[in-house]
Structure formats: C-alpha cells, structure tokens
C-alpha cells in the first residue's frame, strides 16, 4: 500500500467547527489575553532574537515555571517545554512501546497514537468513572488527565499510585490543574516513572501560542529533549508565557470567576434534573443517551451554539456569564 494511503487510512485530522456561533466546544478561556500584556510582550521582544534559532526551552521561562510550581525538590533539569501539551504527549508516544488510556478521555490520545502508528490499549473507566485494573508494566506509558477530560472528575491519589507501582510510566495530564487547584506533582519525589504535563492554553488564555511544559525526573527530561524537535517553541510564544507568569494574579482572578460560574452551572443543571459529573475543569459534562444527545445538539444548532459531543454525553465549556446564562436557558427549554 502507498504510504500516504496508509496514513489516510489509520489517522484522521482533528477538525473544528466554524467560529460563526457561540462556541463552547474546545474548553478555551472566555477571556482574551490582556491587551496591556500583549503590549508588554512586544516591548520585551528583541528584534535580533527573531533571526536566530532561539533556545527552547528558554532558561528564564524554566525559572519562572519552577517558581510557579513552588516546590523545594525540583530544578531546571526537571522541566522542559513543548509546542503545546499536545506535542509533549505526541513525543511520549514515540518514546514508549505502548500507550494506554481510559475512555472517556482526551480524544487526542487515540488520534496521536494512530497517527504515529503506536501500539495502544484502551480500557474504559469503570461505571463510577474510576481507573480499572489493567495489565501494564515497563515499556507502557499510561495517559491520565486529572481532572479528567471530558468528564472533569478527579482521580484519587491512590488510583494514580496503583498504576505507578506496576512500573509503567504515567503521564499525568494536568491541563486543567488551575481550575481544580490540587496537583499530584509531589509524587515526583517518590516515583521516577511519572511525568506531569501542563499547558498555558487554558487558564492563561494562550491556546494560540502553543506552550506546554512537562515536569519529571532528570532522566526522563534528558530523554525527552533528545526526541522532541529542536527549537520546538518559538521565541515569541515563550515570551507570552513569561509575561503571563509575571502577571499570574490576573489569571488567578479570572480562574476564580470561571470556577464560580462552573459551580453555578452545575447547581442549575442538577436542579433541572440533568445527570452531571462533579467537574473540576473549566467545563461541565452532562450524561445523555444517544437519542437525547442528538436532539439536544440539533436544538443548539438552531440557536447557533456549539458544544462538544461524546458517546456518553455532551461537554460544555464555561464561557462568559451571558453565554452561560444562554446555554442554561436553552437546556431548561430542552428539558
């Protein structure tokens, strides 16, 4: 078979809808990156640095990430960056023999595994959304989003440690950490077979800049840096991340609003009789049977609203207050 035909058969693109609607499908931050901080980014850019292959990661960015992590056991040799958290995930699938994940989970795990031709194992979460017993070990990388995407619920520390104790490598995807406020990064003191992945896309309103970072043992970071592309995160993107961390209080205040809106929406949805998860992300998840879900999606299409459909239900991103009010009204009418 022609190699291009083989790729077309096994891999498929990540597609999004047009943005000519109320778009609550991709868990983007409803607030734009502050204009005064955009101005600061461009004031701090050195035009001469634009002509060179700029260091990635930038040592100053690594120092700021370490300060943000606020631990006493990590050094610059424990951190690297990626072109979004997605690149880190993609590279890790090249580093290990097999990728393991637990649907419902982040859809890109399967997309990336198929794209790179990786061996992968999907084992569904239990009915109560816990990590199942699974036969894994050295050579496997187990991807666990925490809070989970798309459901938003949180896995217990004991569940993570159960996988770590098998010897499999655990990629703990904390993309939504800021909306939960609790991290298992301290497990790095105990386990070398762990990497914590984070992103600037969600809480810091920088999805378009593509900046993620990974925290792990020095041995893992050394291996990751050998496999990832050189100069993988642009000078400009790294500057945006540095400025964001310099003004983190702005984003913490915005995150507080998003969390309050999430809790308001969860309360309203429960009162309407919807079955939802206890989401700790910047979204809510509503369980629905296929027929009901399809009817809701069609209803929302007539209102020019996009949410994300999954086999188990729908995920709704927390938007601006007026967007949240609107979606609640439509869900009440639909009910």
Curated annotation (Swiss-Prot):
Keywords from the UniProt entry: Amino-acid biosynthesis, Aminotransferase, Histidine biosynthesis, Pyridoxal phosphate, Transferase
PROSITE patterns membership: AA_TRANSFER_CLASS_2 (PS00599)
Similarity comment text for this entry: Belongs to the class-II pyridoxal-phosphate-dependent aminotransferase family. Histidinol-phosphate aminotransferase subfamily.
Residues of the signal peptide: none
Name assigned to this protein: Histidinol-phosphate aminotransferase
Domain of life: Bacteria
GO molecular function: histidinol-phosphate transaminase activity; pyridoxal phosphate binding
Quaternary structure annotation from Swiss-Prot or TrEMBL: Homodimer.
Cofactor(s) needed by this chain: pyridoxal 5'-phosphate
Enzyme class label: transferase
GO biological process assignments: L-histidine biosynthetic process
The species this protein was found in: Thermotoga sp. (strain RQ2)
InterPro entries: Aminotrans_II_pyridoxalP_BS, Aminotransferase_I/II_large, HisP_aminotrans, HistidinolP_aminotransfase, PyrdxlP-dep_Trfase, PyrdxlP-dep_Trfase_major, PyrdxlP-dep_Trfase_small
């Amino acid at each position: 078979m022609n190699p291009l035909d083989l790729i077309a058969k096994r891999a498929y693109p990540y597609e999004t809808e047009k943005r000519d609607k109320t778009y609550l499908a991709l868990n983007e931050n409803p607030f734009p990156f502050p204009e005064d901080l955009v101005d600061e980014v461009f004031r701090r850019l050195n035009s001469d640095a634009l002509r060179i292959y700029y260091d990635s990661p930038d040592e100053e960015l690594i120092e700021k990430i370490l300060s943000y992590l606020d631990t006493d056991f990590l050094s610059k040799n424990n951190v690297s960056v990626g072109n979004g958290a997605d690149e880190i995930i993609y590279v890790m699938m090249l580093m290990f023999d097999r990728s393991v994940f637990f649907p419902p989970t982040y859809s890109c795990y399967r997309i990336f595994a198929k794209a790179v031709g990786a061996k992968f194992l999907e084992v569904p979460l239990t009915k109560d959304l816990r990590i199942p017993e699974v036969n894994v070990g050295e050579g496997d990388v187990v991807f666990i989003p925490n809070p989970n995407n798309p459901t938003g619920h949180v896995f217990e520390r004991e569940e993570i440690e159960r996988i770590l104790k098998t010897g499999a490598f655990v990629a703990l995807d904390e993309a939504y950490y800021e909306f939960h406020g609790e991290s298992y990064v301290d497990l790095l003191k105990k386990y070398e077979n762990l990497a914590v992945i984070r992103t600037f896309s969600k809480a810091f309103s920088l999805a378009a800049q593509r900046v993620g970072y990974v925290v792990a043992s020095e041995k893992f970071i050394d291996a990751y840096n050998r496999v990832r592309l050189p100069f993988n995160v642009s000078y400009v993107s790294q500057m945006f991340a540095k400025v964001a961390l310099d003004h983190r209080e702005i984003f913490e205040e915005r995150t507080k609003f998003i969390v309050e809106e999430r809790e308001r929406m969860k309360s309203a949805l429960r009162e309407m009789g919807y079955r939802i998860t206890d989401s700790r992300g910047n979204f809510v998840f509503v369980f629905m049977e296929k027929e009901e879900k399809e009817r809701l999606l069609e209803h929302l299409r007539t209102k020019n609203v996009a949410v994300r459909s999954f086999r188990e239900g729908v995920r709704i991103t927390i938007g601006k207050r007026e967007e949240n009010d609107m979606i609640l009204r439509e869900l009440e009418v639909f009910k």
